[in-house]
Amino acid sequence: MSWIREEKLSLLERLTANILKAGPMPKHVAFIMDGNRRYAQKEHKERQEGHTQGFEKLAETLRWCLNLGIHEVTVYAFSIENFKRSKEEVDGLMELARQKFSRLLTEQENLEKHGVCIRVLGDLTLLPEDLQTLIAKAVVSTRAHNKCFLNVCFAYTSRHEIANAVKEMAWGVEQGLIKSSDVSEVLLSECLYSSNSPNPDLLIRTSGEVRLSDFLLWQTSYSCLVFQSVLWPEYSFWNLCEAILQFQMSHRSIQKARELHREEQVLQQMESDRTCVAEILQHRGNGKPMDGQSQQNALLNYSSSREERVRGFLNTLQHKRDAFFDDLSSQAVVA
Amino acid sequence: MASLYEMVWRFLHALLYLQRAIVAWFRVHIWRWKLAVVDLLLPLALGFHNQKKTGPKGTRTSRRVRWGADGRTLEKLPLHVGLLVTEEEIHYTDIANLVVWCMAVGISYVSVYDNQGVFKRNNSRLMEEILKQQQELLGMGSSKYSVEILKNGTNKQEHQVLSCQSMVKVLSPDDGRLSIVQAAQQLCRAVEQKEKTSKDINVSVLDSLLKESKNIPDPDLVLKFGTVQSTLGFLPWHIRLTEIISMPSHIDASYDDLYDALQRFAGCEQRLGK
């Protein structure tokens, strides 16, 4: 089954889509595609069949999203915790991933036509090596596309991602690129795997479970969460519309909370800069009390040099990450 | 065409808001009627069966016994419940009631959160209200629920903690992402001073650092009050496996509402990735 579906929406679906689009729409939607195994059990099918149908549903959902004007989707494909499942099931899932990513590589033309950029978020080193290479190839070959974005969380948990971001910042400190006082909420967000995407506006979890299961904990702090009881392989266009309606009804309050949080962030950064400047001045210890104007200047100087440091560090980090994928994808040519 | 779509959209949303308002109205009023009926019937029933009136102390004891028993009959009880209020209007008495019921059922940790920091700013008012409701609902007689207000020594902020059987903690967005950032800063400082290397940092190091500053287990259940479908910054690190149950409003919330949510929680099965 292909990643990209070209069918158009039916008339009724199109009408509904247009009505929904008259209101605020989410730009980025995240899915926890839960219920594949329960679906297989219900339909008396093989477990693997459930997962396969789950993938097909994903392709269909991507088409709906595109038709609804949602250009970024993040999905939870495989959690680090899922490695605890039976060997048979884990192997089956890895095989499915192999198939789908190989298939993806044969669909280059189509992906280019639609401008689909695929990113894989997670700790790839936990995966079998051949799969790592396949994934890296898919990521590298679609890197330049910029019309729609699909982020696949694979070998991912949010805590792992956050801990990894802290590790990267500590690495930056070790390399002398940043100081420990430069660590801030904004910087941490930029060090996550998801640094190139805006935070999701809407998170949908199917199959009636009401928890996040270690998915995008940081990024969805101020997102609309919708829990739906339908099993993922049975997800329909109308379920998606219902979730969007819920998003629209919460939209104003969430927007307000986000705004408040942003203001808080700016204040914190200013406070931290002020403390750092005060420390520096104390260190110099020339004892002269500074007037307001030169204090202001010192603060401005400090914050612009901090911003430059952080920019430099983030550039280096991006290069490091790109290089990781480049190396992996070129390995296959040798092999 | 676009304006037609917009009209339909507006109409649709007006209908949805109307439906929401009607449901909320019924919820409040049915509850009030129920109370009125119970008030009317209970004295009658007691009057018929028991000439000696038990009085308020008696009903308090029986209620307390019932709540405790409810807690024991549930298959599993959360260790830590977070009360997340997303509403603009806050009723302290209703929140205090919920906290006291949680304690009576046998929940060890209760935290109260709103994203604007209202509870944190009015910490003492909330604590007073909790004490008051505790006496009102549970009565003075029991030493089991005696409450001490402690200053939290480890933290520089003056969190007041009700200790003994249950602990109540007031949380704000500062305990969420910001506390992760602070932990990150602490680790980076250690790296800067060559006490640690970046390779030492992993999930468990960060987790233990974040546990230390909070001193409470991760919440297993969050009760989210209000129509806003979001956690609004509630402890992102800690809600990894938390069940999030939505309730329409904390205003006039009843013990039965809470008990229903606890029952739902008891029915949830966690597979932990398997």
Curated annotation (Swiss-Prot), chain B:
It catalyses: n isopentenyl diphosphate + (2E,6E)-farnesyl diphosphate = a di-trans,poly-cis-polyprenyl diphosphate + n diphosphate. PANTHER family: DEHYDRODOLICHYL DIPHOSPHATE SYNTHASE COMPLEX SUBUNIT NUS1 (PTHR21528:SF0). This is Dehydrodolichyl diphosphate synthase complex subunit nus1. Keywords: Endoplasmic reticulum, Glycoprotein, Magnesium, Membrane, Receptor, Transferase, Transmembrane, Transmembrane helix. Its cofactor is Mg(2+). GO terms for molecular function: ditrans,polycis-polyprenyl diphosphate synthase [(2E,6E)-farnesyl diphosphate specific] activity. One of its GO terms (biological process) is swimming behavior. Its EC number is 2.5.1.87. One of its GO terms (cellular component) is endoplasmic reticulum membrane. The gene is nus1. The chain crosses the membrane at residues 1-23, 33-49, 95-113. With DHDDS, forms the dehydrodolichyl diphosphate synthase (DDS) complex, an essential component of the dolichol monophosphate (Dol-P) biosynthetic machinery. Adds multiple copies of isopentenyl pyrophosphate (IPP) to farnesyl pyrophosphate (FPP) to produce dehydrodolichyl diphosphate (Dedol-PP), a precursor of dolichol which is utilized as a sugar carrier in protein glycosylation in the endoplasmic reticulum (ER). Regulates the glycosylation and stability of nascent NPC2, thereby promoting trafficking of LDL-derived cholesterol. Belongs to the UPP synthase family. It comes from Danio rerio. InterPro entries: Nus1/NgBR (IPR038887), UPP_synth-like (IPR001441), UPP_synth-like_sf (IPR036424). It is a multi-pass membrane protein. It is found in: Endoplasmic reticulum membrane. It is an enzyme of class 2 (transferase). Nus1 seems to exist in two topological orientations, a minor glycosylated species with its C-terminus oriented towards the lumen regulating NPC2 stability, and a major fraction oriented with its C-terminus directed towards the cytosol where it regulates cis-IPTase activity. Glycans are attached at residue 122. The active dehydrodolichyl diphosphate synthase complex is a heterotetramer composed of a dimer of heterodimer of dhdds and nus1. The keyword Mitochondrion does not apply. Pathway: Protein modification; protein glycosylation. It holds the Pfam family Prenyltransf.
